[in-house]
Regions:
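Low-complexity intrinsically disordered segments
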Residues: 18-22
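Serine residues within intrinsically disordered or low-complexity segments
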Residues: 8-10
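Conserved N-terminal phosphate-binding loop of PLP-dependent enzymes in the Aspartate aminotransferase
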Residues: 26-482
Length: 482
């Protein structure tokens, strides 16, 4: 009885907090969002419709089949948190283009910045000359870096390029050649980044891979590698890294860097315990290794912080950014301490399109919009509401094994039953939700985690609408398993 009373008081408190927040913070859609996008989801024809099908047929003939193509429709236009296909169907997007459009699809500030820059200078030749927006953007990134301690930026074209740059820089700085990464990690699909991926799906048929990369267990507490429970485990996974892998497991004294996602993305949207990142910092300091934070997916407001490192006060030596950095235009970067970045001499690293005119204009406008519209704070509020609702669904449905996350970076883990916690591969359930008008993408080492990662400008009403559809899809999927 006392437990039920406490639960009801907690629910009442959460409701009152949300009501108060709605008075202080406008949780409706921005005014610029198109009228058609406000109606999402709105399905007018079975997908793929005739126009989409024509384009899909041509695509299958001429475009590489390497892409997953999860959704069988052709995108036509977008606005806010909605996408319209070529046949007029409007979908509610819970993916933000894989955490790219944090300030919303077709944000007018970004669109206008692209148009203005295209009329002035498309390609900035940043490798051989100077460009004002590149300097402006680097200055902004220095000012918003963790602890304002990372003062120098190198721009590339993607998060994966950022990883490659971080690997090169850490080796150049330390004069060492090995790296520690984590089980469940994802850092890209080229070169060293691919070697650091932990899913066979991405690596199959592409070896051999560069040597000197060692995998440590990430604190995936739901499926602890050591069958322990947090916090009584005392972070055994970190002890294993320090005392097992580093001292006895293989690496010599030649480890240049520890490359880690402060909140693991592709591995299943896994927030580690709060002491994990500070322990990584301490370990790196004691052993002369650089700490590299891969914030490609979790950065720029996604978790309720500008950078997820900020949540634990951890200052990395190098931070990798991408995805949302460009506002929809290809862009990646490493932001590093001057003491680290400044060891590179002219010509040590380069990129033909790094610092490109269009990407600098778009990225600068997008990051400014994230900051000016206080989207990290908005993500924190909407994410708390979404996570509360999803955890209630977890208590209600046997196939929801976990709901976890920070801000609007939430993972919902689907299982065959809570009794066994055996992962349930979810493309079928993903299709059920899509046919109801909700776009979600998946993650997880077992392909059983839904990412709840909409644009941060999404409204409270749309969050609830999407979760309602998710519940309907869960109910249907659970019935199919009986």
């Amino acid at each position: 009885m006392i437990w039920r009373l406490a639960l009801s008081e907690s629910a009442l408190c959460a409701a009152l907090c949300l009501a108060l927040t709605r008075v202080i913070m406008d949780l409706s859609l921005p005014e610029w969002v198109a009228d058609w996008a406000r109606e999402a989801p709105k399905l007018v024809a079975p997908a793929p419709g005739p126009i989409s099908k024509q384009i899909i047929d041509k695509d299958r003939k001429y475009v590489s089949h390497a892409y997953d193509r999860l959704f069988q429709f052709t995108m036509k236009k977008s606005s806010g948190a909605s996408i319209m296909d070529a046949d007029g169907n409007v979908y509610l997007d819970f993916s933000a283009g894989i955490s790219v459009l944090n300030a919303g699809w077709s944000n007018p500030k970004v669109v206008e910045a692209i148009k203005e820059q295209a009329e002035l200078l498309v390609h900035s030749l940043a490798n051989d000359a100077y460009f004002d927006k590149e300097a402006d953007f680097a200055e902004l990134l220095a000012k918003i870096s963790p602890g304002q301690a990372l003062g120098s930026t190198f721009f590339g074209n993607s998060g994966a390029e950022g990883v490659e740059a971080a690997v090169k820089l850490s080796r150049y700085y330390t004069k060492k050649g090995e790296h520690i990464v984590f089980m469940g990690s994802y850092h890209g699909r080229v070169g060293n980044a691919l070697a650091m991926a932990s899913r066979v799906k991405y690596k199959y048929g592409h070896g051999p891979f560069p040597p000197g990369i060692f995998f440590a267990p990430y604190p995936y507490c739901l499926r602890c590698w050591f069958k322990q429970e947090y916090p009584s485990c005392n972070m055994l996974c970190v002890d294993y890294l320090e005392k097992g892998i580093l001292e006895f497991g293989g690496p010599s004294n030649d480890v240049a860097s520890v490359i880690v996602e402060p909140l693991q993305g592709e591995g299943g949207y896994i927030p580690p315990p709060k002491e994990f990142m500070p322990r990584m910092r301490k370990m790196c300091d004691e052993r002369g290794m650089l700490l590299v934070a891969d914030e490609v997916q979790c950065g720029l407001g996604r978790t309720g912080e500008v950078w997820e490192c900020n949540s634990t006060g951890t200052i990395p030596d190098i931070l990798i950014a991408g995805k949302a950095l460009g506002g929809g235009i290809p862009l990646g970067a490493i932001v590093a301490k001057h003491s680290v970045m400044d060891v590179w001499r002219p010509g040590s690293h380069s990129s033909t399109f790094g610092g490109n005119g269009i990407s600098m204009a778009a990225g600068l406008a997008h990051v400014r919009e994230i900051l000016e519209q206080k989207l990290p704070e908005r993500s924190r509020v909407l994410g708390a509401h979404a996570l509360k609702r999803l955890q209630e669904l977890k208590d209600k449905y046997d196939i929801i094994g976990d709901a976890r996350g920070k801000g609007l970076m939430i993972g919902v883990e689907i299982v065959k039953s809570k009794k066994t916690m055996e992962p349930l591969y979810v493309p079928q359930m993903q299709g059920i939700a899509w046919r109801k008008g909700l776009m979600m993408i998946t993650a997880g080492m077992f392909g059983n985690v839904f990412r709840i990662a909409p644009p941060l400008i999404i409204s409270l009403e749309q969050i609830d609408k999407g979760i309602d559809i998710f519940e309907e899809s869960t109910k249907e999927m659970q019935a199919l398993l009986k």
